[in-house]
Amino acid sequence: MQEQMSRRDLLKLGVAGAGALALGAVNAQASALNAKDVKFDEEWDVIIIGSGFSGLAAGLKAAQKGNKVLILEKMGRIGGNSVINGGGMAVANNPVQAKTNIKDSKELFIADCLKAGLGINHTELLETLVDRGMDAYNFLVENGVQFKEHCAHFGGHTVARSLLTTNDSGSGYIQPMLEKFEALKDKGCELRRRAKFDDFVLDESGRVVGVTIREEYRFDDKLYSDDLENTSGTKKTLKANKGVVLAAGGFCRDKIFRKLQDPRIPDDVDSTNHPGATAGALLKAFEIGAYPVQVDWIQFGPWASPDEKGFGTAPILTQQGTFKYGIAVDIRTGKRFMNELADRKTRADAEFKILREKPGAYPITFADTKMAFKDLSEEVVQKGMASGKLVGECATLDDIAKKYGVPADALKETVKKYNEGVKAKKDEFGKQESALSEINEAGPFYVIRLSPKPHHTMGGLKINTKAEVISSKTNKPIPGLYAAGEITGGTHGASRLGTVAITDCIVFGMIAGENI
């Protein structure tokens, strides 16, 4: 792996950016500010960096204890990645499973996560996530989140255990939690947009007692590295009497840091993440001694499409649609090449193999129109169909073959063989029996092209089961510093199962708010 940035990368940064990078290397030795050397502009009990699932959960829990809570969001809109995902949350033994006679267990959920994570999960964190899943569910319902009356069966899960918001979106969590938090304004709580975290303030014992920020900050996605080059905003220093919670998310949009972890990711690759998903807050925690955990494991979403930007709607239309009620096919051969409901890494690797062998030969996934999107809200389906580019509508299998350059006879034989496996209740690629349903060979069909995109950074800060960040200097918690969500590492191991991120974020956000 290339340890230093290339000359080309430095040229992209420009003179100012390269200077900032050099300055950053010097400043890394200096770490954070000392409380005795600063004058605080404001005083709070708890300061939270990030306004997504983890940040709002931590804020609501901390506020329940009577704390004055400030949530800081660097972007102009709240929620980060949390508002643009599919809204699925995996909880074992949830009420919807009970109503629909789905048998599940803590042990089965953990086993599924360990299999996807290649066994390198930090099991104490994973067990906490599973054990407190129902607490998270109840917390969300109490705060106004509305769920559908059925569970979805996502890839890598042995059974259907994923709860879904009624609008098939993470915004179904964020909006009601935000309303609850903003209603606490008269109790001294506030959420501030365009407020970027810059650094920590420590006292002489090493305790985190505050942060430096910039208000009226304007994120600039035209910069090669916003963290290094953007100097916008007015500086302030804020005191946090009880501590700071890092809930700043992952770094899938950070061109520099993600390339250091995986040099195969080109600068121009699209990502499912929002533009502000960078490593700035994570690196500041490393500077004050936080342990890094499994930072080089970056997950690609195998359900994304090259025919739309960012997260889009393909992940929802495929995961809850064509992957479940249809199949995925290699356009070169007309044959299936993977279990459509395997874990994310398995599927992404299978798709990358095809694209390495023939760049541009995007695999397709399809199902008949009667079944394809039947579990999805009309709003999501209409959004997916609106562009006219994402979802192909084909009357017959011959039409699919002609439109996407697939061998027609092989395609027909593939569908026939799949249906025979459905009838025999045995799929050649191991698709779970409960997820098998016949494809109407007569059509018509909905078709989506596939191309994996960077989606979730598996690693991050080492935390314990109290959401305390662990120091590499002492192997003990850094006093006053907590973290939750994608900025942490270890829980998911090498690859996260779909819909476990929301559970992770809510559970450890709650825990941080309870313990701070």
Regions found by a protein language model. Name each.
Residues 1-18:
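N-terminal secretory signal peptides and thylakoid transit peptides that target proteins
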Residues 410-495:
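A glycine-rich dinucleotide-binding beta-alpha-beta segment and adjacent secondary-structure elements
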Residues 65-82:
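Glycine-rich FAD pyrophosphate-binding loop
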Residues 219-308, 508-511:
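Glycine-rich loop(s) and the adjacent beta-strand/alpha-helix scaffold that form part
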Residues 282-284, 291-406:
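An anion/pyrophosphate-binding glycine-rich loop and adjacent beta-alpha core
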Residues 77-99:
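Conserved N-terminal glycine-rich FAD pyrophosphate-binding loop of Rossmann-like flavoproteins
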Residues 131-235, 255-257, 305-306, 422-442:
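Conserved redox-cofactor binding core of oxidoreductases
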Residues 40-52:
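Beta1/beta-strand and adjacent pyrophosphate-binding region of the FAD-binding site
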